[in-house]
Amino acid sequence: MTSRFGKTYSRKGGNGSSKFDEVFSNKRTTLSTKWGETTFMAKLGQKRPNFKPDIQEIPKKPKVEEEDTGDPFGFDSDDESLPVSSKNLAQGKGSSYSESSEAAQLEEVTSVFEANSKCSHVVGEDSFASDRCLLVEDTLIGKEKSISRIPEDNANKSSCTKLLTSDKVENFSEEHEKNSHHFHKNAEDSTKKPNAETAVASEYKADETKETNDTWNSQSGKRTESPSESCPVKGSVRTGLYEWDNDFEDIRSEDCILSLDNESLLEMKDEDLKNRIGGLENLNETFEEDIIQSVLRPSNCRTYCRANKARSSQGASNFDKLMDGTSQSLAKANSESSKDGLNQAKKGSASCGTSFRGTVGRTRDYTVLHPSCLSVCNVTIQDTMERSMDEFTASTPADLGEAGRLRKKADIATSKTTTRFRPSNTKSKKDVKLEFFGFEDHDETGGDEGGSGSSNYKIKYFGFDDLSESEDDDDDDCQVERKKDKKRTKTAPSPSQQPPPESSDNSQDSQSSTNNAENLDFTEDLPGVPESVKKPISKQGDKSKENTRKIFSGPKRSPTKAVYNARHWNHPDSEELPGPPIAKPQRVTVRLSSKEPNQKDDGVFKAPAPPLKVIKTVTIPTQPYQEIVTALKCRKEDKELYTVVQHVKHFNDVVEFGENQEFTDDIEYLLSGLKSTQPLNTRCLSVISLATKCAMPSFRMHLRAHGMVAMVFKTLDDSQHHQNLSLCTAALMYILSRDRLNMDLDRASLDLMIRLLELEQDASSAKLLNEKDMNKIKEKIRRLCETVHNKHLDLENITTGHLAMETLLSLTSKRAGDWFKEELRLLGGLDHIVDKVKECVDHLSRDDEDEEKLVASLWGAERCLRVLESVTVHNPENQSYLIAYKDSQLIISSAKALQHCEDLIQQYNRAENSICVADSNPLPYQNVTNHVGKAVEDCMRAIIGVLLNLTNDNEWGSTKTGEQEGLIGTAMNCVLQVPKYLPQEQRFDIRVLGLGLLINLVEYSARNRHCLVNMQTSCSFDSSFSSGEGDHSLRLAGQVHAVQALVQLFLERERAAQLAESKTDELIKDAPTTQHDKSGEWQETSGEIQWVSTEKTDGAEEKQKKEEEDEELDLNKALQHAGKHMEDCIVASYTALLLGCLCQESPINVTTVREYLPEGDFSIMTEMLKKFLSFMNLTCAVGTTGQKSISRVIEYLEHC
């Protein structure tokens, strides 16, 4: 429904502006509309709940073409003439119309019957003539049939009217006569014992009411043909408001169809009814109005009944009974209806004045609703229909009494000026009309009876549904369902006989208990109620204001808590009929008056049982070899409200993001302090702070990852002009160089580093600065450098050049790339390094220098030479540059350093781990890392390494190096004599380096070959051990020819290699065979073969451990033996290569070498060289130039 339908009922004009005022003020049953003079029949419906479920399962029937299109109230047409169905009266308003006297009631009955004579076939089989002269359910059932038969069944109007009149008056007279004590004696005691009286009254006259209804239904004609489409809640729709509801129900189920053609019976009832009308003249006028508005329709229009009213007739009769003046209360009616075994609460709540949708306060015409979609209270209901009748009948409501009914009528008459959107203390005329037609949703009205049990209801205002014009089969369904419901109601226990509820907890379990609270509210408003029951009218106005706010403005504030029906919505009961499933079950909160006599606990709140959260679905495979898939799903409506946050990061991602953000903040802050615009002290402090951060490896990682190193040094490009800033910058570079990974330096950063190296620390520059400030900066840098690896750093001599040199050495040592080698040469870095080497060598030549300075000089020279070695390997440009730099300054310094080291290594002998000098004096330093011998050893290896690179495949380098005085002799000593002063594991290295240097010197230089051949040297220190006693004289002889010493070295190493090979072959031949595993045996058990381990004794375990240890020792010995064999082979190979190089282009040298060889055969040398070449090709240890040289020597020796 759209909001355009709200125009009819939201008029804000003055009193008397509506056509309905004629009905209220003049008490006339005719209404002048644009279709003409029509008889107005209003049926007080129950209050509709504020719930509107979707009706998706109910098929809508197409409209019958022959139906009368002249809708008297225009619910199917335009906005201006949208009529109000009088049957949609609010439950509370219907109950507020109570009979004041028997004469008034008789007059109302007479007027109702007169009006009904103008209406054609408005009543279904289950007529509610006895329930306020017409049950809403019957009119609803007969809706579609009667609509389609309006032009045809005019002849039946008078008969129907007579039947209704006679039936109703007869039943009413009997009810009034038999149960007058129930009608009037409870006027004052309704609040005390309403439930019991209601039960008595409703059981007393149920049969008679049903009989009259059946007669009326039979006269009206069968209208329902398709029971399958009718609503399954028919029987329960009926609520026992009247005392004769039980009799009415008994007769209805039996005589409904049988009396269809029984015209004689109709006539009898008509006559009897007329006779009884004369005896009921004293009935209240309210009863007449109620019957007129809710039962009868004008003669020129169809009956506006809800399509599902077949089961709702009892609910209508509840309200009729409340208005008839009978002492039955609304709660009793609801308990009667719940006896039917159906969801009476749904029907009761269906009459709530407003829908849950936007069309608040709207009522719908009965003619527009599908028969299966309507309830007693003119509200569309769509529910699971699986709740039992006991679900809503926990307690009985209290009886209003005659005084209460009089009070209700007075309230209606005085509160017609209020609109539904304007709450006030007194009801306006418009409010009365809205309440009269069921458009105001009041807590105190009877509509709240369905509040607790109508959580699954869907409310629609009648008059706007396309299902109203459905076929006749829908009415047939309703008829059959009503019959079953009547029987069920007849057999069901009446909850009205239960004691009144003690608190609002009882009202949560049933619909009738909620109606009980509503009836109590009615009683409060009645003018004739005693003071103990009566409440001020202002309280009623306040409740109306609160209810209006709740309906039209959202949740209202109430002194009491909301009351829910705690029963589950999806648990069917045995007596319930299946109904159309509900798409979205909802819960409607029911608010009770805080001043109810029976409500003791105002703060009790019972939440309903939670619905099934998980739905199990089983998918049957459609193809073979597929499995059945079972899934558990939860509907979105059943899930709790939660906020979905997309793209949530993982914990590790969040931590990483936080770290990155912290780094970004720090670096941005520190960079802002490094700018040249900042004061000098600020820049120095920022640099030291950044260096402190860089002491952490993680921060250095961030700097490299984000490329911030170059940016930092670019900002500090002018630091060389400030002594303190340059010192801080050098400290920052040093800290960054501590990382094992390459520091991403660009050309500008390297240039800055080299410029810092060039700074001279003279006194004049030092005086320019405050000495105190410099000391502070140095102290900070010293503490900072203590936290990092500072093996080679002199903490007592922290200068800019020293820090920059250490940085450069740490960067270029083993980690310098090709671009770095080139930039270092182009920017002048190599010059500074060569100068540093010269400086260190000069310190070595001083005799008075103490050992600490000696070690520092040795470490400085060694580190500079390591850098030069790394930048000259496989780089001819750098080699040539260094050879030519300052007339071979590097070669000269290296030669001097090598000679100093030869002298120092003899002084600080480290052979056999004996740390002693020649005079047997203990060394001043026992720490190996600071030992002089270790420093000398490392420095010797660095010097020979640089010379190897400068002389490799370079004749110029070889010549320049060979020209150095004593260099060839020193190299020969490194091969023959120096290894004896070194530890065993270091001898091989120094010997191979010496042999390699000699090979490079003599390979391309004839001068060097000549010098070496004519040189006198000592024999190898270990030649005597291999020669035995017979060669002892050679060792004592002292000096020998260099060629003879080299041939002797070759023969010794070659013999040692052959001996090692023979031992290895024996080890291979004597390898033990695999012994039988004695740890267990295979056994066959139970038809299976299993390995069963034998129990080991302690002795066996110890023996096994000993064997394992022996095997490990043997393996170590084998490895050592193999290593010794390899060393011997390599030394022999290098010696043979050196001898081969001496023999090139020199027949004299060939003859000299042949003399010292066994039998003068070079085959022993060529075989060793071939093995070495194969090994070199296998390991790719050297470049192609070395392999070519070996191949050339082999070829030459083979042709000798």
Curated annotation (Swiss-Prot):
Its main location: nucleus. The keyword Cell cycle applies. Keywords: Acetylation, Cell cycle, Cell division, Chromosome, Coiled coil, Cytoplasm, Mitosis, Nucleus, Phosphoprotein. GO terms for molecular function: ATP-dependent protein-DNA unloader activity. The keyword Cytoplasm applies. Residues 83-102, 327-336, 1082-1094 have a biased composition (Polar residues). Residues 503-513 have a biased composition (Low complexity). A motif (FGF motif 1) lies at residues 73-75. It is found in: Nucleus; Chromosome; Cytoplasm. A motif (FGF motif 2) lies at residues 437-439. Residues 635-1179 form the WAPL domain. GO terms for cellular component: chromatin; cytoplasm; cytosol; intercellular bridge; mitotic spindle; nucleoplasm. Deubiquitinated by USP37; leading to stabilization. GO terms for biological process: cell division; mitotic sister chromatid segregation; negative regulation of chromatin binding; negative regulation of DNA replication; negative regulation of sister chromatid cohesion; protein localization to chromatin. The modification Phosphoserine is found at residues 77, 226, 228, 355, 388, 452, 468, 470, 914. The modification N6-acetyllysine is found at residue 168. A motif (FGF motif 3) lies at residues 462-464. Residues 1-668 are annotated as: Mediates interaction with the cohesin complex. InterPro entries: ARM-like, ARM-type_fold, WAPL, WAPL_C, WAPL_dom. Regulator of sister chromatid cohesion in mitosis which negatively regulates cohesin association with chromatin. Involved in both sister chromatid cohesion during interphase and sister-chromatid resolution during early stages of mitosis. Couples DNA replication to sister chromatid cohesion. Cohesion ensures that chromosome partitioning is accurate in both meiotic and mitotic cells and plays an important role in DNA repair. Belongs to the WAPL family. This is Wings apart-like protein homolog. It comes from Mus musculus. The lineage of its organism: Eukaryota, Metazoa, Chordata, Craniata, Vertebrata. The gene is Wapl.
